[in-house]
């Protein structure tokens, strides 16, 4: 009962956030150091998923600052990282790279996802317990809000999610 209630509350909060993004209710932008956001959230996920023995490599060359709402920048990075950590098998590798205004997060995988569906609300290629199916929809909403290019590709048993700033 408690788990179901918690899931419904999280689902409701996420849907409200999606609606706020789509309605343009995040006008305050500031200069965000994405390197710091990525490093902070990567450290957090490494701690949370330490028991799964995932190898996470961060390759950030140079400065990477953008003009965004701080909350939305965090939402974007958080959901991309969470997706990689949740959908990686124990002992596998996650690679995060930032260069030339592009952030790419990749993780091991065995089969390509449906690129026409993965960013849609409630789509779940492989159902994971506790998942709302809204994480990548949030990523898509933030990218659309800021006119960022969002791309998914699968190559040599790896999933690649890339966001490029103009």
Please state what every model-predicted region is:
Residues 3-8:
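Short alpha-helical segment of the dimerization/phosphotransfer core of two-component systems
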Residues 84-85:
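Short helix-loop "hinge" at the ATP-lid/N-box region of the Bergerat-fold HATPase_c
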Residues 55-65, 99:
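Conserved catalytic submotifs in the C-terminal HATPase_c
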Residues 91-102:
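Short beta-strand/loop element within the Bergerat-fold HATPase_c
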Residues 23-28, 65-68:
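Conserved micro-motifs of the catalytic ATP-binding
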Residues 147-155:
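Glycine-rich ATP-binding loops of the HATPase_c
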Residues 111-124:
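Short conserved segment of the HATPase_c
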């Amino acid at each position: 009962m408690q788990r179901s209630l918690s899931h419904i509350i999280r689902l409701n909060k996420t849907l409200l956030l999606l609606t706020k993004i789509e309605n343009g209710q995040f006008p305050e932008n500031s200069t965000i150091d994405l390197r710091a956001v990525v490093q902070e959230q990567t450290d957090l996920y490494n701690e949370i998923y330490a028991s799964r023995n995932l190898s996470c490599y961060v390759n950030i060359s140079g400065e990477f600052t953008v003009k965004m709402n701080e909350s939305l920048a965090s939402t974007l990075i958080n959901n991309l990282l969470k997706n990689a950590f949740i959908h990686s098998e124990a002992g596998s590798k996650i690679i995060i790279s930032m260069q030339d205004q592009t952030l790419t997060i990749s993780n091991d995988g065995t089969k390509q996802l449906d690129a026409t569906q993965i960013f849609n609300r409630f789509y779940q290629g492989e159902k994971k317990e506790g998942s709302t199916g809204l994480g990548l929809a949030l990523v898509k909403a933030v990218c659309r809000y800021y006119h960022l290019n969002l791309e998914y590709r699968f190559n040599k048993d790896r999933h690649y999610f890339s966001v490029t700033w103009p």
